[in-house]
Amino acid sequence: MPNIHDVEVRDLQVNADQRGHLVEVFRSDWDEYEIDPEMSYYSMTYPGVVRAWHRHLEGQIDHFVCPKGRITVGIYDDREDSPTQGELDTFVIGEHNQQVIRIPGDCWHGFKAIGDEPSLLINYPTNLYDYEDPDEERIPYDDDRIPYDWNAEIHG
């Protein structure tokens, strides 16, 4: 259950049979996608690699899904006008815990691939990526402004 204002989590239904499984990861009638995504991309990440921290200041909302492998997602709220300013949320998602996480883009966020295999993250952002002027502010994964240790023991 998320603590941060505007973060939402939806359990995804895994429809499995003897052939494998099928999982819906985007439906326009889901509340988490109240603003339709403008694009989609995937990121393959090797075990132990951290991709953090960044945020978007132009209103983008991200929607993370991890269909293969496992990742820890970290979200930190330092928005001055937020009722949850200073809160940190973490989630472990992946092939054995299929969820979509709605992330307000103006919160710092990132993820770490955990386990022994590469992880696949799919994102459905609400803004197109602008190669000439990216809407991204970045700080190192171990920046002291965010009270999170990516190497801490995983409980989930």
Curated annotation (Swiss-Prot):
One of its GO terms (biological process) is S-layer organization. Keywords: Isomerase. This is Probable low-salt glycan biosynthesis epimerase Agl13. Disruption phenotype: Impaired formation of the tetrasaccharide present at 'Asn-532' of S-layer glycoprotein Csg. No effect on 'Asn-47' and 'Asn-117' glycosylation of S-layer glycoprotein Csg. It comes from Haloferax volcanii (strain ATCC 29605 / DSM 3757 / JCM 8879 / NBRC 14742 / NCIMB 2012 / VKM B-1768 / DS2) (Halobacterium volcanii). Gene3D superfamilies: Jelly Rolls. It is an enzyme of class 5 (isomerase). It comes from the Archaea. Belongs to the dTDP-4-dehydrorhamnose 3,5-epimerase family. Epimerase involved in N-glycan biosynthetic pathway that takes place under low-salt conditions (1.75 M instead of 3.4 M). Participates in the formation of the tetrasaccharide present at 'Asn-532' of S-layer glycoprotein Csg, consisting of a sulfated hexose, 2 hexoses and rhamnose. Involved in the addition of final rhamnose (sugar 4) of the tetrasaccharide on the dolichol phosphate carrier. Substrate binds at R19, E24, M39, S40, Y41, R51, H54, H109. Pfam families: dTDP_sugar_isom (PF00908). The keyword Isomerase applies. GO terms for cellular component: cytosol. PANTHER family: DTDP-6-DEOXY-D-GLUCOSE-3,5 EPIMERASE, THYMIDINE DIPHOSPHO-4-KETO-RHAMNOSE 3,5-EPIMERASE. One of its GO terms (molecular function) is dTDP-4-dehydrorhamnose 3,5-epimerase activity. Pathway: Protein modification; protein glycosylation; Cell surface structure biogenesis; S-layer biogenesis. Its EC number is 5.1.3.-.
